[in-house]
Structures are given as structure tokens and as C-alpha cells.
Amino acid sequence: MKNVRVKALAQWVSNVTGNRDGLVPLPVEASARRFYRTTLGERSVVVMDAPPDTEDNAHFVALSNCFRHAEVSVPEVLASDLERGFLLVEDFGDNLLEQTYGLGQDNKVLDLALAMLVRIQGISDPIIPAYTAERFSAELGIFREWVLQDLIGVSTLPFDDV
């Protein structure tokens, strides 16, 4: 099934971009999504395979548009096939903040990050769901499992009452 999906994705990318160079896999993350890199003309772009049975791709596109309208730096969705979960998005490259801003510029990075968080917090749009106690509890559960237990191997007992 996976090979069939990758072939369908590669064909879609070829149809959309005219690029027949293929897809270069990017590191996997903790989701059903898979990412690849290819080219569109002279620039690099990211191809996202986000199976629609597990990913809300229409919401992803809507959030991207919402954030871009609010001048929050997020990748532009260049093309999509929401029924199949194929998206072509702007490539921000491989540079991390710590690589972009040299040693000793920690405050500059923190200031930029905080300014962006303030901008995001100020967005009032129905596309952004309210942050509920249930959502917080679910995310705290992920933190307990992935970070505390799996990543650093500590007991979650101090957090059980939160």
C-alpha cells in the first residue's frame, strides 16, 4: 500500500510541477504524514503526504491561509489534492533558528519567538479552535508519554495530579 501511495504522490507531483526528478524523503515525524523534497522550477519545495483518513488537510490549508494573512511566517500551500492528502508547500529549508542566529544572540531569537507568539495569540478567527481543558489534558498526556517516559525516562507521578 505504501509503495502504491508513494507512486501516486510522485505522479501527482509530476503533473503539478512538471518535475520528473523524483522525491527525496525527509526525516519522519510522529504522525502519519510523510515529507519529501523536490523542485519547482529553480526552487526547492516540500511535498507532504498527509493521508486524509488521519489528517484534516482542509483545516491545515485554512490555518496556513489564516496565519499568512496575519503575517505569521508559515509555509505557503502551493497546490493540493485534499481528497488524496497530497500537498505541495513552500520550503523554508534546513536552517534552524540556532544556525541562523549565532552564539550570543539568544535574546534576539527569544524576542523574535515571543513576538510571533503574541501575533498568533492576537489572531481571532473561527478556523482556530478554542483551547479547552480537554485539549490541554490530551496534550499533557502526550508530553507525559513522549517526553517524560520515552525521551528522558522519568516517572510521571509528579504530573498525575495536574
Locate predicted features.
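ATP-binding glycine-rich phosphate-binding loop
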Residues: D21-Y36
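Juxta-kinase regulatory segment immediately upstream of eukaryotic protein kinase catalytic domains
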Residues: M1-D21
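A generic alpha-helix signature
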Residues: V4-A8, A58, D161
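Residue-level detector of short coil/turn "hinge" positions at structural boundaries
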Residues: R20-D21, V74, T156
